[in-house]
Amino acid sequence: MRSSLCWLLTLLLILATAAQGQPTRRPRPRPRPRPRPRLRPTPSFPQPDEPTEPTDLPPPLPPGPPSVFPDCPRECYCPPDFPSALYCDSRNLRKVPVIPSRIHYLYLQNNFITELPVESFKNATGLRWINLDNNRIRKVDQRVLEKLPSLVFLYLEKNQLEEVPAALPRNLEQLRLSQNQISRIPPGVFSKLENLLLLDLQHNKLSDGVFKPDTFQGLKNLMQLNLAHNTLRKMPPKVPSAIHQLYLDSNRIEAIPSGYFKGFPNLAFIRLNYNQLSDRGLPKNSFNISNLLVLHLSHNRISSVPAISSRLEHLYLNNNSIEKINGTQICPNNIVAFHDFSSDLEHVPHLRYLRLDGNYLKPPIPLDLMMCFRLLQSVVI
């Protein structure tokens, strides 16, 4: 019994000694989070506005290779085989370079030009052709145009002009001012332009009050006048009698004065599409003009076919309010005997193309219409 007790005490002593000899395990310390850097407070400056001119414009194109002409502006191109021409178009230019005196044809379209400095044109007195389409020109200094006596063609389409430029050269033959913001025509601005053949003022802001009885005074040889896409309610007064082509589409014209076209012996082409014309606003024989060849009256409020000349070749009456058509009534030569199939076409009406679709008509084409207009090649209903 005593020996068993001694053995038990010895075993406990051995276990206690072994436990004291082992190292004590400590828990691993968790990594501390890195301190976040403190952001300095940003001062509250006002936000800048959207970029405005000229910062919103693309950069000008780099200069091209050296030219064979020492006076050629680096930002332009001077073709060796065409020494009188200067091409500065589509180069993101803000300013007009100095134009050499040898230049007759100047191309500056598709840029960001806002003005025409006098210094740029002081030597270019022989210019005949200037193309400034699609720029940002708001006004033309009359001192520039006064120094260009040989100018024949002036293109200023797609700019920001608010009035027709003054001091236009006397020898001008074509003046193109479409797609601007023009709402004013200075008095007498055309008075010295006897050589002008074409005047294009479409897509502007011209109203009836702009046109006075003397607005077109001086345009003795004008052949083409384009006033389409404006805000006219009346026919313009005192249009030059030499006119051949008259464009008045997309206005708000409601009526044509009696005998309005009688004073135009050379008028061959009329466009009055997209207006507000009705039978009440069309006096009898309004379009019965001896030299008229093409007449556009589509997209109006016309309910009957107007009287036409026997020389008319193309008639557009589509998209109106026409319900019926009587060939006997509209026949210029008042043909009654439809049994006459004579081959003599000397006095037969010249109408070759007739468009009537978009009305209230239904096929077939009336027989009396075909008997009158025997030269018809196409009828659209």
From Swiss-Prot:
Cellular compartments per GO CC: extracellular space
LRR repeat feature ranges: 94-113, 114-137, 138-161, 162-182, 183-206, 207-232, 233-253, 254-277, 278-302, 303-322, 323-361, 362-381
Organism domain of life: Eukaryota
SMART domains, alphabetized: LRR_BAC, LRR_TYP, LRRNT
Basic residues compositional bias, start-end: 25-39
Places the protein is found: Secreted, Extracellular space, Extracellular matrix
Pfam families reported in the protein's UniProt record: LRR_4, LRR_8
Residue span of region Disordered: 19-65
Secretion signal span: 1-21
Glycan attachment sites: N123, N288, N319, N326
Disulfide bonds: C331-C372
Main location: secreted
Biased segments, Pro residues type: 56-65
Protein family according to the UniProt entry: Belongs to the small leucine-rich proteoglycan (SLRP) family. SLRP class II subfamily.
Function: May anchor basement membranes to the underlying connective tissue.
Domain remarks in the Swiss-Prot or TrEMBL record: The basic N-terminal Arg/Pro-rich region binds heparin and heparan sulfate. Binds collagens type I and type II through its leucine-rich repeat domain.
Quaternary structure and partners: Binds the basement membrane heparan sulfate proteoglycan perlecan and triple helical collagens type I and type II.
UniProt-recorded name of the protein: Prolargin
High-level lineage: Eukaryota, Metazoa, Chordata, Craniata, Vertebrata
GN (gene name): PRELP
